[in-house]
């Protein structure tokens, strides 16, 4: 069946910012979708608010709209294209997660799609409703002979209470049409039911929740299926959760293929899955179905279905080599499975189900260390911020690799001191699912607990527990063996142990280098296998590799050189985490693409299954491997050996993947690996405060006074000399980890006690904190001689809030020409002083006309994608070319960089782009269910970002807020409670809100000040202030929780008593999902955004149009000059 000829123009909706529950797997899916559609000759319009994605690069669509993903904005795109005579024929929403699906449903229900003749493809409206609506799906499962958990859909709290009485406690609360289990949880008491169901009714777009019987402790499985228009169905992959029901699948360690299913259970699950897929009506695409099995009686029930490409779809794609998103798009435009060729084998059609002769393990990455108040218990609400995946020939080999891929400071079992406690305490901990529970499984077994006991208390299947038990036996052998011989060492490596783990057990081997030397002498090295989708039945034509240590010494590697071109290894960024996310993958992908087009064979090394970089056709060759020194070095050796007289490895790129590869640079260089671009010595120079200070002194550049301390006494002396407040942090961190503003000696002592434990090898840095300064971010390129300013960003929040959490504007809004000239001169001096070859990010603070240098990072920054989208300059591609020998003047001549000028010169009429951070406060809760504090500071907390771009700042800021958190209010009530130091500065923005018609309420002190300034204001009492006669009865928190407040402005009070009241105010705002502004500058920006919203003239423009306008502006400026 050929492609549909009635489709000419398809609209693709992305998933928006990276949030917990919806990450960069949808950039991977969306990028594939755009590639396929354009390859089929279709015109593509794309809507996605996330500038850090590959899919929003202008070359992936004909019309790229970096706009909020809301029904209103998507409708504007549809209308704009129709008015231009370029009507959109179809909407593909099954590749953008829950955000895209919910937006498509709203557009259908509002009549927009019918009005403009737009067809839903991939899954129609009825299929989405049947798959997503809890009650309809439950009825459908029963119709095909399946069973669901006993449950009822409830629309009111009265219905909830009746259902709980019928089912009995505990129950599971699941809101409809939400992602990542948002709002769901296990309720063990009536109080918990009330809290969770109340929150769930708010979280659900359809305002209903499913109350179902608890199946906590059951085994959980998933199937990935695809169906075409001829009713052919393939089961792509089965996935088993190591953690039992009760832990969200995104937070569980998962294994593919499923390990513990009987043949009867698998066949029953498969038959049910196919029947459900057909009954739901997903006839041109893929879906994910989750099942649970009672381990005691074998009862099998269907949990839920995603009638779209999901997080698990990305995992299944990378696990099998079967490109689910790509094939889903081909099915959506009319092809059938038998007409689509397998990209890996180039012979078999897509109707051949994948077969695996290896095991895949995925493990989640958490960020609880960033949120000390958050409850670390794993529940049905997803909390992980990223994940890693590994492949091995057996389960324990893959498990060992994935554990060291997570970069948590532990490199697998036995690489960190065991927590204190006896076996009973460890078993008690295992009853509550937490981040490190597999370590407790191993420890319990080592302390003498039986496999059965550990399985019983943890709910983990005995097979998985027994596999870890085999590792415990192997550990005992390694410790007891008089000599580490070839057979034992080979077995250790075959079972996934790293050199680091082995040296922890055998310290006489003198570290990793000693273990590696011993392996080499004994001829023990990894072989590299190929992911081929067919268990070696057909030859793989696509080089997608993983390592394994085979027991057979004669086993051979399957890596073969693709060309005689020189090879470049690109080290990715590993699992997403706060501080190191999709922005770095963006730069790695750009490097692979541009170097492949410029005479190099590109080799990607990464372990993140969500990313575009680990798509098998991004680089010329892919290694799905941990980003550790040992694993990267072995890949380098394999590539060198495979050259066989041809071109070897020209170099390894470490400066694009964030801190992870940077941390490997010096050791790799010492091992003889060529590092291209900025040298490891220059990287270290930028991190060494003393050496970097010398660079600044030579250039005559001021920096905040600072000192380096390794003891509290030293830190106290430095702080006394500098003057409080001071900024303290450990060296060599990303995302501001461990960074705090300290106001007094007592707090400093507390910090030093914690921070030195955080970083043993590097000292603590103590800086003067510049209050009320304007922070500036600069991304620049340097070829060793010439410097090219990519972009200058002005932070909206003041210095002291981490740059990754602060909104910023490009071009700067308040900086003058003289300020920009200071920035240029300082950046050029720093780039040359360090010796940068490639990208450089510098952060400045401007205070009283003095430009202070805060820090310089000779690497790609998280703002590179944003700057590239805002300026139309591909900084990451240019960086890759520069690192491999091109000059800036050459790139100007080729047209990759502007022929004259750069991002330090703002073109006339340039649009304003605003980047806003997206924070996970609605996901992470305290143990009592209360929201964690939304206050920002020097430690980064955001998971993702959005971009708003328009003609002026107000419109651009309004778009950024809509994309990140929902529209700013244009009427209603604003609550104001601010610290004394901020009251004078907040008078103007609050007066403007009152003039716009807002009702202002405030606590006593703030209300008195506002009334003195002529601003009408009603008073409410503080949360912890008892009601008094003649005083307001209503507290601020009561008003917020009652829904009587539309926006909160609350700046922190420092360490004084009112700080607790501020927490209650901010957490209440998070709970009811209203804007909560915590800085003066943020309030001023919000007012400008609200004014733009009231005017109502916010339109949409594609990046292609905006970039054309930028080019025209630059040309006009050049003519004037």
UniProtKB/Swiss-Prot annotation:
Coiled coil: none annotated. Mg(2+) 2 binds at residues 304, 306. Residues 138-333, 693-884 form the ATP-grasp domain. Keywords: Amino-acid biosynthesis, Arginine biosynthesis, ATP-binding, Ligase, Magnesium, Manganese, Metal-binding, Nucleotide-binding, Pyrimidine biosynthesis, Repeat. Mg(2+) 4 binds at residues 855, 857. One of its GO terms (biological process) is glutamine metabolic process. It comes from the Bacteria. Its EC number is 6.3.4.16, 6.3.5.5. ATP 1 binds at residues 134, 174, 180-181, 213, 215, 220, 246-248, 290, 304. The keyword Nucleotide-binding applies. Binds 4 Mg(2+) or Mn(2+) ions per subunit. Its cofactor is Mg(2+); Mn(2+). Pathway: Amino-acid biosynthesis; L-arginine biosynthesis; carbamoyl phosphate from bicarbonate: step 1/1; Pyrimidine metabolism; UMP biosynthesis via de novo pathway; (S)-dihydroorotate from bicarbonate: step 1/3. Mg(2+) 1 binds at residues 290, 304. Mn(2+) 4 binds at residues 855, 857. This is Carbamoyl phosphate synthase large chain. It comes from Mycobacterium leprae (strain TN).
